[in-house]
Design a protein with these regions (language model features):
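Conserved nucleotide-sensing/catalytic segment adjacent to the nucleotide-binding pocket
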Residues: 3-65
Length: 136
């Protein structure tokens, strides 16, 4: 899916949806600042990737300023990486954890079904607790 200017419904379970806003591609890859992409958004759930580069700290600083609840799946190794895990040599994971992010490390190689289901379950639990689930 491509980034749009509107939120959309994500079906988490049959006939149970939640409103999300999707940023397709990380702000770092897109050459955009997360705050600019997210201005005027009212969705309570944002799906976004963060590129593992030094200037990703700008996105993390925005997350901290906005007091977002953050769940991270660090794809390590990434889809196109060699089959070796990398250390957090930029300190981004430590920085995210210091602002209360929940972090999991998953392989970006192979079948994504398990990690996608993990994301759906996390979003569902978070959304149910906040009464954000709607019929679809």
């Amino acid at each position: 899916m491509r980034t749009g200017s509107n939120s959309r419904q994500l079906e988490l379970r049959p006939h149970e949806c939640v409103e999300i806003f999707l940023i397709s591609g990380s702000p770092e890859e897109r050459g955009e600042y997360a705050e600019d992409v997210l201005k005027n958004q009212s969705a309570r759930i944002i799906l976004c990737s963060i590129q593992y580069v030094q200037h990703a700290t700008e996105t993390i600083d925005f997350i901290k300023r906005e007091d977002f609840r953050t769940y991270i799946q660090w794809l390590n190794p990434g889809h196109n990486d060699v089959k070796t895990q990398y250390w957090d040599y930029l300190g981004l994971i430590s920085r995210l954890m210091s602002i209360g992010a929940t972090v999991s490390i998953r392989s970006g190689q192979g079948n994504p079904t398990g990690r996608v289901q993990e994301l759906r379950e996390f979003i569902y639990g978070w959304a149910v607790f906040r009464n954000l689930i709607v019929s679809c």
